[in-house]
Swiss-Prot record:
It is found in: Nucleus; Cytoplasm; Cytoplasm, Cytoskeleton, Microtubule organizing center, Spindle pole body. One of its GO terms (cellular component) is nucleus. Pfam families: Lge1. It comes from Schizosaccharomyces pombe (strain 972 / ATCC 24843) (Fission yeast). One of its GO terms (biological process) is epigenetic regulation of gene expression. The keyword Cytoplasm applies. Keywords: Chromatin regulator, Cytoplasm, Cytoskeleton, Nucleus, Ubl conjugation pathway. This is Small histone ubiquitination factor 1. It comes from the Eukaryota.
């Protein structure tokens, strides 16, 4: 509103709006047009009469004031795209690829391979856990037996050395 209001200059003595474009107009017609413009260009109205708008600004007001860009297609491309199948027989429509029957068998084989590999992984983990548990349990027994066998060999050697025939 303020940008359009700057185009009109207010003279306090005449109580009229003076347009800088109408400087060479005779006074009677100027006052009559100004009187009409003052009635239509009130403070409460958001925009002045459309006669003051230039044709370019009134047609482009949507484009300038809107955050979106409006583009009108230059040719009838929208009509051609929607009515192509009915009007033109030479136009090839895009082919729809239906799901292949082998895809389901491939999916099943992949699922079974995944289940088999996960099952074999579980088996390996269980075997490892059993071996670790067994080794932890047996290790102390083996260590004790090693000590006993070393002691037995030593005592046997001592006995052989001490006995005389």
């Amino acid at each position: 509103m303020s940008s359009r209001r700057n185009d009109y200059h207010y003279d306090g003595n005449d109580h009229q709006y003076r347009s800088p474009l109408k400087s060479n107009v005779d006074q009677n017609s100027f006052y009559e047009s100004s009187y009409r413009s003052r009635q239509s260009y009130h403070q409460r109205t958001k925009t002045p009469r459309s006669s003051y708008d230039s044709p370019s600004s009134s047609t482009n007001s949507k484009e300038h004031n809107s955050p979106y860009h409006y583009r009108v297609p230059s040719n009838n491309s929208t009509r051609a795209s929607f009515g192509a199948a009915s009007t033109d027989t030479n136009v090839e429509l895009p082919k729809i690829n239906l799901p292949d029957s082998s895809l389901s068998s491939k999916l099943q084989s992949c699922k079974s391979a995944c289940e088999n590999s996960s099952q074999s992984l579980l088996n390996v983990e269980q075997q490892y856990a059993q071996q670790v548990h067994f080794w932890e349990k047996i290790r102390t027994d083996i260590y004790r037996e090693g000590l006993r066998s070393d002691a037995a060999v030593k005592s046997l050697n001592d006995f052989v050395n001490n006995v005389s025939f």
